[in-house]
Curated annotation (Swiss-Prot):
Positions with a binding annotation for phosphate: R104, K246
Family designation: Belongs to the aspartate-semialdehyde dehydrogenase family.
Residues that bind NADP(+): R11, G12, M13, V14, T38, S39, Q75, S167, G168, P195, Q352
The organism of origin for this protein: Buchnera aphidicola subsp. Baizongia pistaciae (strain Bp)
Sites where the protein binds substrate: Q164, E243, R269
Keyword Cytoplasm in record: no
Subunit structure, as described in the record: Homodimer.
Catalytic activity: L-aspartate 4-semialdehyde + phosphate + NADP(+) = 4-phospho-L-aspartate + NADPH + H(+)
Name of the protein this chain belongs to: Aspartate-semialdehyde dehydrogenase
InterPro entries in UniProt: Asp-semialdehyde_DH_CS (IPR000319), Asp_ADH_gamma-type (IPR011534), Asp_semialdehyde_DH (IPR012080), NAD(P)-bd_dom_sf (IPR036291), Semialdehyde_DH_NAD-bd (IPR000534), Semialdhyde_DH_dimer_dom (IPR012280)
Gene3D superfamilies xref list: Dihydrodipicolinate Reductase, domain 2, NAD(P)-binding Rossmann-like Domain
GO biological-process terms attached to the record: 'de novo' L-methionine biosynthetic process; diaminopimelate biosynthetic process; isoleucine biosynthetic process; lysine biosynthetic process via diaminopimelate; threonine biosynthetic process
One Pfam family linked to the record: Semialdhyde_dh
Organism taxonomic ancestry: Bacteria, Pseudomonadati, Pseudomonadota, Gammaproteobacteria, Enterobacterales
Length: 369
């Protein structure tokens, strides 16, 4: 018998990508979907593969929610906080799959990334776990690209610098980034290509605009286009941002590490739209050759591609422009550092909305249906 599965937040950015992937993989043929809304209950629901799925249900109606076998939420932490615990309190024993961060570190929650921790997921289902949550986007993308080194237990510690896309903050942030880009172009467009105007004068006009009150920065609070923001999320007591804290904490939970792998670094927002990039310095436990490392990385999963450490390959295949909209999680710039043969550099790229958010949720369903 097909399971009844509720989808909440399916029209948002992550939810839309999730539904798109589910259609692409013919997932909707394998269960009965019920679509919910937090703001437009009783509105017309979607038609998928020629089948109309009825009006939207109220996402806050516990009586409807509690009748379902599985709930998938891409609605965010506020919704999870309002609904999840109430559902559990009234005895709902179904599976909760969530993209939000609020439940990740709870003891009764499993962080899901099946190419990395499928055994943990299966064991948790057998043990009665009911809550499965996607990981932080940078963590999931790092583990996809560097998974072979983790699975072979070759890593002693990692330092990382992230280059995170606007999509990690949400849809309105992507829109604001594009508005900033458009505003800068409008300011400069009348002068570009005109030899009578020096590029320094044009740059000054754009710079003055970006520092003015006219510049669109309601969400970011500061310019991102033509700039960057070296801080993401709240401040922790030790001086880390919460985004930086998540990397070590979530990685070791996903890996079920007996001894924590030490990971730290700086998380930076840049003007990419939906692809996160990361630069790593990795201390290996032993000296192994670059060809061996490349083979270990390639063997881990079918989405990881090793990009040769050459300028043309790197510029054409190891960028957000090359990776956006794909499930590829390439890794490149692999070389030993001058400080020692156990020290490895690496650079990775991955789509924040796919492996960084929606794809682990979609694949989790395979374990449950």
């Amino acid at each position: 018998m097909k399971k009844n599965i509720g989808l909440i937040g399916w029209r948002g950015m992550v939810g839309s990508v999730l539904v798109e992937r589910m259609i692409c993989e013919n997932d909707f043929f394998h269960f009965n979907p019920i679509f919910f809304s937090t703001s437009q209950k009783n509105s017309k629901g979607p038609t998928i593969n020629g089948e109309y799925f009825g009006v939207l249900k109220d996402a806050y109606d516990l009586d409807i929610l509690k009748e379902l076998d599985i709930l998938i939420s891409c609605q965010g932490s506020d919704y999870t906080n309002k609904v999840y615990f109430k559902l559990r309190d009234i005895g709902w024993n179904g599976y909760w799959i969530d993209a939000a961060s609020v439940l990740r570190m709870n003891q009764d929650t499993v962080i899901i990334l099946d190419p990395v921790n499928s055994n943990t997921i299966r064991e948790s289902i057998d043990s009665g776990f009911k809550t499965f949550v996607g990981g932080n986007c940078t963590v999931s993308l790092m583990l996809m690209s560097l998974g072979g080194l983790f699975s072979e237990k070759l890593i002693e510690w990692i330092t990382v610098s992230t280059y995170q896309a606007a999509s990690g903050s949400g849809a309105k942030y992507i829109e604001e980034l594009l508005m900033q880009m458009g505003s800068m172009y409008t300011e400069a467009s009348g002068y570009l290509g005109n030899p009578a105007h020096s590029i320094l004068n044009i740059e000054k006009k754009v710079r003055n605009l970006s520092c003015s009150d006219k510049f669109p920065k309601k969400n970011f609070k500061v310019p991102l286009a033509g700039s960057l923001i070296p801080w993401i999320d709240k401040k922790m007591r030790n001086g880390q941002s919460r985004e930086e804290w998540k990397i070590q904490a979530e990685t070791n939970k996903i890996l079920s590490s007996n001894k924590d792998i030490l990971i730290d670094g700086l998380c930076v927002r840049i003007g990419a739209l939906r692809c996160h990039s990361q630069s790593f310095v990795i201390k290996l436990k032993k000296d192994i050759s670059i060809p061996e490392i490349e083979q270990i990385l390639l063997n881990h999963n079918s989405w990881t591609k090793v990009i040769p450490n050459r300028k043309h390959d790197t510029m054409t295949e190891l960028t957000p422009a090359a990776v956006t909209g794909t499930l590829n999680t390439p890794v490149g710039r692999l070389r030993k550092l001058n400080i020692g043969q156990k020290y490895l550099s690496a650079f990775t790229v991955g789509d924040q909305l796919l492996w960084g958010a929606s794809e682990p949720l979609r694949r989790m369903l395979k374990f449950l249906i």
